[in-house]
Amino acid sequence: MRDTIRTALCCMVIAPGTLWAVVRLGGLERGPLVQLLAFTPYVAAWSVLPAVVLLALRRWWLAGVALLVAAALAGAVLPRAVGSAASGGGVSLRVLTANMQFGAADAGALVDLVRERRVDVLVLQEYTPEAEVGLRAAGIDAVLPFHRTRPLPKASGSALFSRHPLAEDGVRENPGHFTQAYARITLPGARPVSVESVHTTPPAHLDNLNYWRRDLAIQPAASGDTLRVLAGDFNATLDHAALRALVSRGYRDAAAATGVGLSGTWGPYLGRNGRKPIPPITIDHILADSRIGVGEVSTHALPRTDHRALAAELFVPAIQG
């Protein structure tokens, strides 16, 4: 009887990790599981503990299951910390994306970061009329004189600033009603590249999930003659099947490709009155066309926003002949 109880308790220890691995590897996230899947890297780290405990207790077959679960989660997560992409040749394009949190981000600090990182293209989400005034006053036009913006109240606005002239530029609205500024940019000696400021509906409520999936699904694929870069707040991590499906359409995640894909870009978030502590997660991304090389990728703190800015140096294929 006691042995049966101990076995049942041991099964309970490995059950959460096992179910998590099944959902993650099977792309089965539904309802509130969508939010939970963002924390898969933390669960992957925790999953080693049950295996160690069960080995110490000599529960060999249960320990074997726990080790398989830990290995499966590690296989899903660790490649982001290793990287595999070589930068290759091409013309340098430095991209910076930042969510301004209802336009409150420190405009002066953002422009300073643009100068420091020698940014060629800046894409912004939650771009408000107040943010536009602040950036103009901070001197954004002197650094990135070409722009396409749609300042809107609260979280719906979008902006794209560039060191180089824009063509075929515009702003589109997602099903979830956030806007996305986009433009084709031509660097001297390089093929044209289309850059878009991505902002999808957050899956913070069950009512938003359909919009979230649709927002991700309608992002343009990287195919044909047009080189593409999608950068912004995707409100999804690489543990979400919907984002992995987008990446599979001709992109690679710049941070994951260079081994910094576990760097948190949102949080830690304390919630209202500090009662809901949420650890950092990686929901901001720069997705580069797989034909574009990827160099250094880094995150940067910005005052007055709960997102970190994400910077990447990309290498656009040169014009041949």
What are these regions (language model features)?
Residues T40-A70, G176-H199:
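Glycine/proline-rich, flexible active-site/cofactor-binding loop segments
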Residues M1-M12, L55-G64:
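N-terminal export and membrane-targeting signals
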Residues A56, G64-E116, V133:
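N-terminal signal-anchor transmembrane helix
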Residues V95, Q101-R115, L124-G321:
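Soluble catalytic domains of enzymes that build or remodel membrane lipids, polysaccharides, and related
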Residues L28-E29, R59, A85:
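Transmembrane helix-loop junctions in multipass membrane proteins, especially transporters and channels
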Residues A8-L54:
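Membrane-embedded alpha-helical segments of integral membrane proteins
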